[in-house]
């Protein structure tokens, strides 16, 4: 051909022409109307006309200069719009050379595609070309005008209820039974129809979407997603932390109407709480992390895969929490809808809270409604009722309640909220920022249970029985409060509608946002890390990773807990109380005494059943305690292991118990510097927190009864001779404690609780005790800080009066040995020096 005879200077031009021709061919698109041959022909023709033809009919060859001039064209074609301005100049010029005109296709007959080739919409592992019907439809929701993410939240309460709490007579005809209803679309009494349909439509578009795609988009779209569970068991714990802060620590630091705390860490009363329908237990883990051993929890939840996972409480001591599964106790099934379980749990809680009830109850019940998400409210109605019923059953007067709810469109659900509104001082519906905005979850928060709610509780109990009777039938309880009663309270109704519609609007925007994030995987929420940091700071939660507690040996833990205290102190033995040392118990008012039942030991708790004892001698090791009991980690006590007895003769039962003489560290709290009386009071509180009344198989833990030395005679009243099994029928001296169990006493510990140079006296004119400083001669009725005898002073200065052979402390014992200290000698000395 002619071109092969051209000079070498035309070689670069050839290559350029070839590239242009290839580009034109690749940019031409096959048309559904033409066969491939015509398409190829058109492409070739187009390439020929744009890049210069080799055919001899053209008459002459385009020179390199004319090609370069054409290549410098300023635009695609005259009048091209700016919609192509994002393409660089080279590509625009190439398209111009191929004869591109806006609105027309390439090719001889303009048969090429007219639109720009779209980016791939392929998502995940779907098949090529799969289209999810409904998902790609326009929602016409502007999610971009959502409020700026913030850690600050506002609470809106229902107005205070001025209606009297309904009584049995008034509620006698409130329950309405009718046909079971399984649609939600027409529930427009407490929400606008348009909003209701919109939120249901938005939820429905996700039905066809792969779950993993949904989760990934939700994670990117939610500005609060990175908060997660921090170092807790799950996200539920952080929801509770969130709401506890928002409601001014209403749960972990409840206050009376004057703002005074109802429980204090230094005082004897525990913070009692209940956690129902709450496995695996995130709510409880948060409360116990916040309050430690100053709180005691009771739990009821379904047994099985959704049970409490106490072994996963890494940040709190699960020994302070006691699951109880209703009828059958620890062997029950935990089904809150069974009336017998409700009664059993109520009785158990009241029996173990001095018949007062808990300070607050948390309920977080829910179950999978996969495929029926829009009916979640209807399917969960009995669960919601039973959680409300449990609150009215176990919460004390003035106590609080928090419960997860879902949609609240039906008159049945709104009726339940109305009853809470009547029974509590204040009620609100609240969605914390830790609850994902796209779901229907929110919480009903109730403050201050009123007096006189028993009849409402009984009414809800009867409704639950009716629901159980109608199960698996076509009938259902459709109303618990008549619509005219609810709507007669205009302020309640207005709040309910505002709350529902506001919640719907939030959901609609959040769902539309997730949909947008599914469609565009490049979208992200840029402030997630910043918001997380701000929230944790505000709520008082350390930004730490979740790590399992490290295991350690008892000796290392002991040295960690005593923090450099001289170890020799722990090997001190008590001074024997004899006729020669009797003067040491002066002044009498400085001393307390306790009945001994065995050798004193130190006990350390490393968590659960990892408990060890040590006799105080450096040469001896810590020995694993062979008892079935549990203690929180970082606990150090001074104890005796005592064999307790109950009953006499063949029916007599023996059990080994831990008797606490003094406390050093309680679940990480060092109390050694506090007054002896305060330490004993905290020990009593600690024992209440760790006791497990539902577990009779466990060895009990008790605190020694402490007597004032001047009241020692009270001890002898509780001594009697009893026949001990295995003692050949010979009666033995026994001391009976507060719980009607008795043990064989070995003597009496006498502990000085006032530090030198202070001592105690009794003012006859004021008829009260006072403190006197022997050095400065000062006296005061208030306890001076330096008069408190810390643990090591009490331990070092204690005396022990041994009740061995020759010591007669009960009239039925053998005669007194005249060379030993007698009961009469001690009582006479005390009486003389306590006046």
Swiss-Prot record:
<feature type="binding site">
    <location>
        <begin position="374"/>
        <end position="376"/>
    </location>
    <ligand>
        <name>substrate</name>
    </ligand>
</feature>
<dbReference type="InterPro" id="IPR050851">
    <property type="entry name" value="mRNA_Cap_2O-Ribose_MeTrfase"/>
</dbReference>
<keyword id="KW-0489">Methyltransferase</keyword>
<keyword id="KW-0808">Transferase</keyword>
<feature type="modified residue" description="Phosphoserine">
    <location>
        <position position="91"/>
    </location>
</feature>
<dbReference type="GO" id="GO:0006397">
    <property type="term" value="P:mRNA processing"/>
</dbReference>
<comment type="function">
    <text>S-adenosyl-L-methionine-dependent methyltransferase that mediates mRNA cap1 2'-O-ribose methylation to the 5'-cap structure of mRNAs. Methylates the ribose of the first nucleotide of a m(7)GpppG-capped mRNA and small nuclear RNA (snRNA) to produce m(7)GpppRm (cap1). Displays a preference for cap0 transcripts. Cap1 modification is linked to higher levels of translation. May be involved in the interferon response pathway.</text>
</comment>
<feature type="region of interest" description="Disordered">
    <location>
        <begin position="1"/>
        <end position="66"/>
    </location>
</feature>
<feature type="domain" description="G-patch">
    <location>
        <begin position="87"/>
        <end position="133"/>
    </location>
</feature>
<feature type="binding site">
    <location>
        <position position="234"/>
    </location>
    <ligand>
        <name>S-adenosyl-L-methionine</name>
    </ligand>
</feature>
<keyword id="KW-0539">Nucleus</keyword>
<comment type="subunit">
    <text>Interacts with POLR2A (via C-terminus).</text>
</comment>
<feature type="binding site">
    <location>
        <begin position="203"/>
        <end position="207"/>
    </location>
    <ligand>
        <name>substrate</name>
    </ligand>
</feature>
<keyword id="KW-0949">S-adenosyl-L-methionine</keyword>
<feature type="active site">
    <location>
        <position position="364"/>
    </location>
</feature>
<dbReference type="GO" id="GO:0004483">
    <property type="term" value="F:mRNA (nucleoside-2'-O-)-methyltransferase activity"/>
</dbReference>
<feature type="active site">
    <location>
        <position position="239"/>
    </location>
</feature>
<keyword id="KW-0597">Phosphoprotein</keyword>
<protein>
    <recommendedName>
        <fullName>Cap-specific mRNA (nucleoside-2'-O-)-methyltransferase 1</fullName>
        <ecNumber>2.1.1.57</ecNumber>
    </recommendedName>
</protein>
<feature type="binding site">
    <location>
        <begin position="335"/>
        <end position="336"/>
    </location>
    <ligand>
        <name>S-adenosyl-L-methionine</name>
    </ligand>
</feature>
<feature type="modified residue" description="Phosphoserine">
    <location>
        <position position="28"/>
    </location>
</feature>
<dbReference type="GO" id="GO:0006370">
    <property type="term" value="P:7-methylguanosine mRNA capping"/>
</dbReference>
<feature type="binding site">
    <location>
        <position position="439"/>
    </location>
    <ligand>
        <name>substrate</name>
    </ligand>
</feature>
<dbReference type="GO" id="GO:0005737">
    <property type="term" value="C:cytoplasm"/>
</dbReference>
<feature type="domain" description="WW">
    <location>
        <begin position="752"/>
        <end position="786"/>
    </location>
</feature>
<feature type="modified residue" description="Phosphoserine">
    <location>
        <position position="66"/>
    </location>
</feature>
<feature type="compositionally biased region" description="Basic and acidic residues">
    <location>
        <begin position="57"/>
        <end position="66"/>
    </location>
</feature>
<feature type="domain" description="RrmJ-type SAM-dependent 2'-O-MTase">
    <location>
        <begin position="231"/>
        <end position="450"/>
    </location>
</feature>
<dbReference type="GO" id="GO:0005634">
    <property type="term" value="C:nucleus"/>
</dbReference>
<feature type="modified residue" description="Phosphoserine">
    <location>
        <position position="53"/>
    </location>
</feature>
<dbReference type="Pfam" id="PF01728">
    <property type="entry name" value="FtsJ"/>
</dbReference>
<dbReference type="InterPro" id="IPR029063">
    <property type="entry name" value="SAM-dependent_MTases_sf"/>
</dbReference>
<dbReference type="GO" id="GO:0032259">
    <property type="term" value="P:methylation"/>
</dbReference>
<feature type="binding site">
    <location>
        <begin position="277"/>
        <end position="283"/>
    </location>
    <ligand>
        <name>S-adenosyl-L-methionine</name>
    </ligand>
</feature>
<keyword id="KW-0507">mRNA processing</keyword>
<keyword id="KW-0506">mRNA capping</keyword>
<dbReference type="InterPro" id="IPR025816">
    <property type="entry name" value="RrmJ-type_MeTrfase"/>
</dbReference>
<dbReference type="Pfam" id="PF01585">
    <property type="entry name" value="G-patch"/>
</dbReference>
<feature type="modified residue" description="N6-acetyllysine">
    <location>
        <position position="108"/>
    </location>
</feature>
<dbReference type="InterPro" id="IPR002877">
    <property type="entry name" value="RNA_MeTrfase_FtsJ_dom"/>
</dbReference>
<dbReference type="InterPro" id="IPR000467">
    <property type="entry name" value="G_patch_dom"/>
</dbReference>
<dbReference type="InterPro" id="IPR001202">
    <property type="entry name" value="WW_dom"/>
</dbReference>
